[in-house]
Amino acid sequence: VTCSYARLFCSPASAQRAAPAQQPQQVDVLVRGGTLVDGTGSQGRAADVGIRGDRIVFVGNASASRVTGSRTIEAAGLIVAPGFIDPHTHTGGDLSNAERKSNLPYLMQGVTTVLTNNDGGGPVDIGAQLAGWTRNGIGTNAAVYIGQGSVRGAVLGPTAAAPTPRQLDSMRAVVARAMNDGAIGMSTGLYYAPGSFATTDEVIELAKVAAAHGGNYDSHLRDESSYTIGLLGAVSEAIRIGREAHLPIHISHIKALGADVWGQADTVIALIRSAQREGIKVSADQYPYTASGTSVGASLLPRWAEAGGRDSLRMRVADPATRTRLVAEMEVNMKRRGGAASLLISSTRDTSILGKRLDAIAVARHTTPVEAGLQIILAGDASVASFNMKDSDIEKFMVQDFVSTGSDGSDGHPRKYGTFPRLLREYVYTKHVLTLPQ
């Protein structure tokens, strides 16, 4: 049964008014005997839950209230909770696929609502995306962003050039249409091309359009490490966008990625708290893994090398002077990630390298890790699990009241199907970083 989060919170008072104890009532499904943890932060309590259609219509003592169910689920010894909301997924493709539209990797974790088109991606025709899901049906509730990277790519292509006034107006129009068609805000992936080519001012102009339609700003930061402006600079940039565009901001998969920024969690938290005191609405999500998920290209290539797309990259590689510069900067980026052994191929069309680390691939190919990485990129790239975070930073972010859990799920990384179980097992029941009500 898929029920919305908001409805569960609203239902108890209204349900009890609608169903006095002396009047028997029948529900479709009665979940009986469980411990209800309702998401408000309150301690769990014994309560039965009655569902009719797609609504929760009763929360309380079913026997005392004479509530019976056409179907009864015995939940003694189990926790009953609202369906989880995952604020950061990459489920757009799955929901549009006839064989995967049920979204089982999420439903099986207890996730009943997903947000998607994060990281500045997804289609620009939001109306068509939502209409397709409505027509064909999907397994979870879903909400979508309009991706700034997709918007920029649609108007400017893969160029790093600044938009002309006319092009900027065109991008504004795309965002406005998407918001009118049902997007809840604008997402950015300022670490990824082509979104990374936008200046802060350019992003602010598009965010203002989302704000005018009541939307929020969701961002994969421009830098979660020390690639360009640094983690602290990137957090400050996101806060500036919220301040100047006048909209709430949400930082995706908040983290300190790589040894250069390990230990900066406290400073990041202080920046966010300062912005909140200023009146800016700031929230974040994270996944409970020390390995991030990205591509070989995004891990190793400097941002300038991505301008113009794959064909332009091939031309740069073919030029001896440019190649020398490229390889040198890729070496630095590999060290930021923790070295070649920290990059595990998690999804690729080349099955010969699937499940292998980049250092082992380099040995098998009799070349250096950077050259092996460049070969993979030019052959179409591959997804990697990148082991680059410390538990101490993860836990400091986790306990903040503005941080929720989001999977950032992608093929090949266990976070797509294991984020919420891992959070409960590892950080609630084993390490006691969080309590169950939290």
Question: Each predicted region: which residue ranges?
Answer:
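Active-site neighborhoods of metal-dependent hydrolases
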Residues: 145-146, 150, 154-165, 169-193, ...
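Boundary at the C-terminal end of the N-terminal hydrophobic targeting segment
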Residues: 13-15, 21
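Divalent-metal coordination cores built from histidine and acidic residues
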Residues: 75-80, 84-91, 95-188, 207-208, ...
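Short, ordered loop/turn segments at secondary-structure junctions
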Residues: 62, 119-120, 189-191, 221-223, ...
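Histidine-rich, glycine-flanked metal-binding segment
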Residues: 23-28, 36-83
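Charged helix-capping and loop-helix junction motifs
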Residues: 99-101, 200-205, 232-237, 266-268, ...
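Divalent metal-binding pocket/active-site signature
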Residues: 177, 183-236
